[in-house]
């Protein structure tokens, strides 16, 4: 299990020196990556995440996206990161005036549906 943890830390861009550091010595972004990694290593079947890409650099965002795409449980997230939402969600719940409306697909599909446009075909690029 120690090897699995070290490998996971490496995927989240932690150097061997950082792995040996105390948590209090890490930056805010590094502590955020540790917290995300801890969540992903636990045996959860539901993750609730509020703005999970905040404080992450591009490599860390890519790593998080890949981990969440491969995550076998359910994810409920709030995010203003449109790219992140396009990569990891397959359903959006919109709460407006006390009513929840479900939109199937990613963020781009949601925006297109709101504009009355059909979903994109595989490989098609959105101009929305």
Predicted stretch roles:
Residues 1-128:
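ABC ATP-binding cassette signature C-motif
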């Amino acid at each position: 299990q120690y090897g699995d943890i070290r490998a996971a830390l490496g995927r989240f861009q932690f150097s061997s020196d950082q792995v040996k550091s105390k948590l209090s010595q890490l930056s805010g972004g590094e502590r955020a990556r540790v917290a995300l990694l801890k969540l992903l290593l636990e045996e959860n079947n539901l993750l609730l995440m509020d703005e999970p890409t905040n404080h992450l650099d591009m490599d860390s965002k890519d790593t998080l996206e890949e981990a969440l795409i491969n995550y076998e449980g359910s994810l409920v997230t709030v995010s203003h990161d449109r790219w992140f939402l396009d990569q990891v969600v397959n359903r959006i719940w919109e709460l407006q005036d006390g009513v929840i409306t479900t939109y199937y697909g990613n963020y781009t599909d949601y925006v297109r549906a709101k504009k009355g446009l059909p979903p994109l075909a595989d490989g098609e690029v959105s101009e929305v």
